[in-house]
């Protein structure tokens, strides 16, 4: 048996939650000790640099990248429009990668793990191989994100465009999910959504594995922070809510309170009115353990929030929303707020009590250790591979 791992962007550097999820999958696939080839697209936003991949990873598998121009264009949109396909997916079609897949040796059983629906354009050529079985790993139900965008915008042109993109994407998602040999959703929420689409393909939830962390957060700290890539609209909206609606109210009661905002694709800005923009943080573990209370008023999106899981693994006290906690099983140590007023109140309770910060943080940490163990996740993957 051999493995072919396809990604729509380089795994390294791990600049966002998607890369983090792919890094975890790559490490799991290598842990199976099955010979592995890794094909990745390189885009304008996510260029390829071989040296960003750790040396031990490069030594354990064959890595090849293919340049893709994915920045949306009017010409590209109308070409896709008249061809009747999804522009969201068509942008990731590269002839060189298709040829490489077509020529990939299939003289022995081959498992292909495809990251996200954005690589669905390669399914037809993959299915021509007699010995290949395709597993699609779903990070989100992508068409649902575009429906949410359509519902959120007040611009009638954007509403029409987003609805059109969602409908085209939904058709191709259903087709791809139906043609795959197996689906690997990250969460039970997405697994249920796939079933509701009428998909009969076997679906096995493969959560994001997290290494156990021995250290815990510093519970003497009661300042606030948010971390997330700022090229993702739900994170942009959450930061705006924090800065404009939640933090100013808290600042009245706690004049010396600070809010740190961190994440890739954001600029550093000096402390102003208690808010500091840190940009990308190189030592995530240290940042999580030393920054206080994670506040994440996420109001849109689907799939699991990788940064929340990472913070939970470090025992960080967290306040978020039902959408922010989507995909994470219940009784997880997260504090869920239902309104902006409730969000502010829950933060107030944590600011006031070190014991509460410790109790909720340690509950979250224990939850992650129980449900997201790499050994448990690896066992599930190997079992599913053996079935094919």
Indicate where each model-derived feature is located.
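Donor nucleotide-sugar binding/catalytic pocket of nucleotide-sugar-dependent glycosyltransferases
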Residues: 162-166, 170-214
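Acceptor-binding helix/loop patch of EC 2.4 sugar-transfer enzymes
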Residues: 8, 74-87, 135-171, 229
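Conserved catalytic-core segment of nucleotide-activated headgroup transferases in glycan assembly
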Residues: 205-290
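N-terminal subdomain of nucleotide-sugar transferases
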Residues: 1-61, 107, 249
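A charged, aromatic-enriched C-terminal amphipathic alpha-helix characteristic of glycosyltransferases
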Residues: 352-385
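Acidic donor-binding loop of glycosyltransferase active sites
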Residues: 181, 286-303, 314-317
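Conserved acidic donor-binding segment of nucleotide-sugar-dependent glycosyltransferases
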Residues: 334-341, 348-355
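Short hydrophobic beta-strand element within catalytic cores of glycosyltransferases
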Residues: 307-310, 317-320
């Amino acid at each position: 048996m051999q493995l072919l791992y396809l990604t729509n962007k380089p795994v390294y550097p791990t600049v966002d939650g998607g890369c983090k999820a792919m890094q975890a999958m790559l490490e799991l696939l290598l842990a199976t000790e099955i010979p592995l080839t890794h094909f990745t697209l390189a885009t304008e936003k996510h260029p390829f640099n071989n040296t960003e991949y750790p040396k031990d990873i490069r030594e354990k598998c064959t890595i090849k990248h293919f340049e893709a121009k994915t920045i949306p264009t009017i010409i590209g949109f109308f070409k896709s429009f008249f061809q009747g396909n999804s522009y969201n997916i068509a942008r990731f079609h590269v002839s060189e990668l298709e040829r490489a897949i077509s020529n990939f040796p299939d003289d022995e059983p081959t498992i292909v793990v495809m990251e996200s629906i954005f690589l669905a354009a390669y399914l037809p050529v993959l299915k021509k191989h007699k010995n290949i079985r395709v597993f699609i790993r779903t990070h989100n139900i992508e068409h649902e994100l575009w429906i949410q965008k359509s519902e959120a915008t007040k611009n009638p042109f954007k509403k029409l465009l987003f609805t059109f993109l969602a409908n085209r994407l939904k058709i191709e998602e259903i087709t791809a999910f139906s043609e795959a040999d197996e689906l690997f959703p990250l969460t039970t929420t997405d697994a249920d959504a796939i079933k509701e689409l009428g998909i009969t393909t076997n679906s096995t939830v493969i959560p994001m594995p997290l290494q156990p962390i021995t250290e815990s957060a510093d519970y003497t700290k009661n300042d606030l922070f948010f971390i997330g890539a700022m090229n993702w609209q739900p994170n942009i909206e959450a930061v705006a809510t924090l800065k404009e609606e939640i933090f100013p109210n808290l600042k009245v009661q706690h004049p010396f309170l600070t809010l740190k905002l961190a994440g890739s694709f954001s600029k550093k800005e000096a402390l102003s009115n208690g808010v500091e923009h840190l940009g990308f943080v190189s030592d995530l573990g240290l940042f999580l353990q030393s920054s206080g209370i994670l506040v994440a008023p996420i109001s849109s999106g689907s799939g699991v929030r990788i940064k929340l899981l990472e913070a939970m693994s470090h025992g960080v006290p967290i306040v978020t929303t039902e959408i922010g906690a989507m995909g994470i099983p219940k009784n997880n140590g997260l504090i869920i707020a239902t309104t902006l007023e409730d969000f502010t109140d829950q933060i107030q309770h944590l600011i006031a009590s070190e014991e509460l910060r410790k109790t909720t943080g340690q509950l979250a940490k224990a939850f992650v250790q129980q449900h997201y163990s790499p050994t448990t996740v690896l066992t599930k993957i190997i079992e599913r591979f053996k079935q094919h």
